[in-house]
Amino acid sequence: MEQARPIRRALLSVSDKTGILEFAKALNERGVALLSTGGTAKLLGDAGLPVTEVSDYTGFPEMMDGRVKTLHPKVHGGILGRRDQDDAIMAQHNIYPIDMVVVNLYPFAATVAKAGCSLADAVENIDIGGPTMVRSAAKNHKDVAIVVKAADYARVIAEMDANGNSLKLATRFDLAIAAFEHTAAYDGMIANYFGTMVPSYGDNKEGDAESRFPRTFNSQFIKKQDMRYGENSHQAAAFYAEEHATPGSVSSAIQLQGKALSYNNIADTDAALECVKEFSEPACVIVKHANPCGVAIGDDLLTAYDRAYQTDPTSAFGGIIAFNRELDGATAAAIVARQFVEVIIAPSVSQEARDVVAAKQNVRLLECGQWTAPAQGFDLKRVNGGLLIQERDFGMVTQGDLKVVSKRQPTEAELKDLLFCWKVAKFVKSNAIVYAKEGQTIGVGAGQMSRVYSAKIAGIKAEDEGLTVAGSVMASDAFFPFRDGIDAAAAAGISCVIQPGGSMRDQEVIDAADEHGMTMVFTNMRHFRH
């Protein structure tokens, strides 16, 4: 068979031993000779498989506590040797061709993620022989198959069975790509880890501002889907995800029905889901163009959805809806009967809800899984020729963090609304103003160049939907540079304001609140969002 290569000898040396015994048995049953090292060789030998230790094959023992195992010409000559072209020199040095290499690498990421991991621990989990064999086999994919993922074991055996114990070039090439991706990610993790130690060059990174970010930033994402287009129809696009995306994210979500997700669908769904995660009560967030246009909590999801929708039914048309509880049939029925929706996402979806939404085949229904702790990692923003990297904004305040700076004190009900409103403001594009009352947004002013106009827009939105502003609270994602935003809020009927404070004119702004008989609370925390 043209470009197919028979598999007669395989070298197996894996850190993650998932499925390796079954794979080795399958290879042995097909007449493949097995070479192996260390723990892998012991596992295979204990299972009764005929296996040759690499040290017996090379005539050179493992040494230096296993640091040197496979770095030998008889190993790499067998992997890198070009069939036909190098046969004579291989025979001269008694080098056997190695047709398949099965390797995955020391668990560096898992090691450095452990509490108390020392530099010495990290160093000992830097694989040397493994990546060298992987790269050698991938380089010589014309003749050699390299397998780095347990998920590929079954398809390798299936193809061998279909092709007389041979693998096609297309398969070997695909496996080689996976191998280079594997070593690239591995080296990137190591570079990131050591890069955070500059300039301390040691275990103790406390107090080093530079240590939060490595000298070079390496990250790897796996393509999840190609898209019809990007943000606009003239832009090509694709969606990439982290290899181990955490549950409770758009990247890990399973699509239960509907059209393929678009670029804008994914961006908006992420915004809605991250916002709804802030609430412990049953909550609903409706997003349009990455901005919450309606957010509410309730005793149940249906109540939360009804109240979120009431904020701005006009903007909710064609929006994204996120929940923090299992989507039930009653809530799904209300959505389908009431509005056109692009995406619905929830931790889980009941069978009744699935059946209801199935009546609208184009609606994208996503089940994201339940989240626990906030996802770690960085926020990344591409700029022309560069990349901005920052810690994710996990900042939030509790009632005990608030500082009342006005003469009037907030009531308990107002304090609850202030904290609710503050959570929403964190996810609104700056300049952000949010009006809320009794756990429901009643007006959102987003993305304006001046804060006072965001305040005016929030009031207009509430008025247009017939919602009562009187007695409501207002959140601002950043400080008020002038009193005009407070005057606009007072004119609309706002009774309490929550904001970071920190302006040169704070006293002027506080005085304005006192003049209007309003409560003002400082958080000492800003939530810009661009």
Swiss-Prot record:
Its EC number is 2.1.2.3, 3.5.4.10. Pathway: Purine metabolism; IMP biosynthesis via de novo pathway; 5-formamido-1-(5-phospho-D-ribosyl)imidazole-4-carboxamide from 5-amino-1-(5-phospho-D-ribosyl)imidazole-4-carboxamide (10-formyl THF route): step 1/1; Purine metabolism; IMP biosynthesis via de novo pathway; IMP from 5-formamido-1-(5-phospho-D-ribosyl)imidazole-4-carboxamide: step 1/1. GO terms for cellular component: cytosol. It comes from the Bacteria. One of its GO terms (molecular function) is phosphoribosylaminoimidazolecarboxamide formyltransferase activity. Keywords: Hydrolase, Multifunctional enzyme, Purine biosynthesis, Transferase. InterPro entries: AICAR_Tfase_dup_dom_sf, Cytidine_deaminase-like, MGS-like_dom, MGS-like_dom_sf, PurH-like. Pfam families: AICARFT_IMPCHas, MGS. One of its GO terms (biological process) is 'de novo' IMP biosynthetic process. SMART domains: AICARFT_IMPCHas (SM00798), MGS (SM00851). The IMP cyclohydrolase activity resides in the N-terminal region. HAMAP family: PurH. This is Bifunctional purine biosynthesis protein PurH. The gene is purH.
